[in-house]
């Protein structure tokens, strides 16, 4: 992955308008410093890391805002004012770009 990032960063015209989203397809299990949601139809299970590499990101910043894989699609739709790109992004919850405060699914522990 670092090869791709280096290639883009070495092209100033491309880099100045780029955001690279790096995420994994699954979490690392139940060893987690944060809340681990129960896995159910509505529960999210373990957290999945995402790294954004861009000239627009703050150096050394860590953001704990709730997001999921669909959040990337929703970001693209909102940023470029596009219609929903897939059936999975038709809803507006959770939509980290429009929610204030922390989001926990309905199956969160009480």
Predicted feature descriptions by range:
Residues 1-110:
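N-terminal pro-sequences and low-complexity stem/linker regions of secreted or lumenal proteins
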């Amino acid at each position: 992955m670092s090869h791709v990032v280096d290639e883009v960063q070495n092209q100033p015209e491309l880099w100045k308008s780029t955001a690279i989203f790096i995420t994994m397809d699954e979490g690392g299990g139940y060893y987690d410093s944060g809340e681990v949601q129960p896995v159910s139809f509505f529960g999210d299970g373990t957290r999945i890391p995402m790294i954004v590499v861009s000239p627009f990101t703050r150096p050394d910043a860590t953001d704990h805002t709730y997001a999921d894989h669909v959040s990337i699609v929703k970001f693209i739709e909102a940023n470029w004012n596009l219609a929903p790109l897939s059936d999975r992004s038709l809803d507006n919850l959770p939509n980290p770009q429009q929610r204030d405060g922390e989001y926990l699914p309905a199956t969160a522990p009480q």
